[in-house]
Amino acid sequence: MKKLLFVFAMVAGTTFSASAQVQQGTILVDAYYGMPNLYKSAFQSLVSAADATNVQSGGIGPLGVRAEWLAAEKFGVGIDVCYSDAYVTEDAFGSDGMPYSYELRSPKIGIMATMNYHFVSTETVDFYFIAGGGWKNRTLTSTTDDPNYTTDSIDMSLLNIAARVGVGARIFFTENIGINLGVGFGQGSIFNGGVSMKF
């Protein structure tokens, strides 16, 4: 983590132009994918510990979209929508001796309002601090085609609060298209990156 923040700081210090990459009124849209997916990692660890050949685990995300409007030259407000999922599936014989499929799944969706402070902005790079808060919902759901088994869904979001603090960067290869990188804590996981567009 410290090394990554150091790299962010080094690049931020090498400004090649005084021209602003983002200006008041600019709209920025990021599509991103984050890592790690902690629930996916936990499910995979359980499967590995069980050493079962008929059990599989997987997941997707965090996968998200951010939109930001520059209310001032260095200050932006926006929204962040993020989805992730993790699952474990097992094929086994039920109490009646017939083969059935069993699945445990934990999807999560979060929607946040965000505030960004852009501390470095040049023709090619944009570095910013991000803080956000909003709503999230995570459930733990069991499903099966076994008629003798009761399916269930549990709300795992104790406070239903989504939040994130961190730093991010956008590197533009053209006037309107680039990539984004982020490191922080909360929605979107520890690391995330993807494609950025500027309007």
What is the predicted role of each segment?
Residues 1-26:
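Cleavable N-terminal export/targeting peptides
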Residues 20-71, 190-198:
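Short glycine/proline- and aromatic-enriched beta-strand/turn motifs that initiate or cap beta-hairpins
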Residues 25-27, 57-63, 105-111, 125, ...:
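Residues that define the transmembrane beta-barrel architecture of outer-membrane proteins
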Residues 31, 65-69, 111-117, 131-135, ...:
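Residues on the lipid-exposed face of transmembrane beta-strands in outer-membrane beta-barrel proteins
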Residues 103-105, 118-122:
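Short, charge-rich binding segments
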